[in-house]
Amino acid sequence: MSADRNANRNDEALKDASTPVGTAPVGIDELLERVRAGYDRIGPAEAATAAEAGALLVDIRYAALRDRDGLIPGALVVERNELEWRLDPRGSHRATEAVGHDLRIVVICNEGYASSLAVASLRQLGLHRATDLIGGFQAWRAAGLPVASV
């Protein structure tokens, strides 16, 4: 068997193993569209208003971006790879801010893409009021909302 045919067969096997039975793989744009169809996203002004009303703003940007661009005052900083563990109210590693499943959470990434995927995961944990910021931190800053230096 030629190397190309063997490589194609391996690619197909990997695709089959990682795709739930009965579903075809999708691209990231379609995945985002599907995820976002399940909830209402909010803009910067609405996120600021939500925070004033008690919502938890959660900044999932990585450290280099926070160092470069600053922080949203009052936002909880949680690395993306720890998010579910820190916000699951039933989890043993939860943040003190993770007070219950009814908590309004606004997830913020840099531009509003990774946050949508994070919200899908939080909603699977029962955090049904989780949403994300359209345009992410960059939209927050462009709207002239408060940003603190690191």
Indicate where each model-derived feature is located:
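Rhodanese-like catalytic fold shared by cysteine-dependent sulfurtransferases
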Residues: M1-L56, A63-R104, Y113-V150
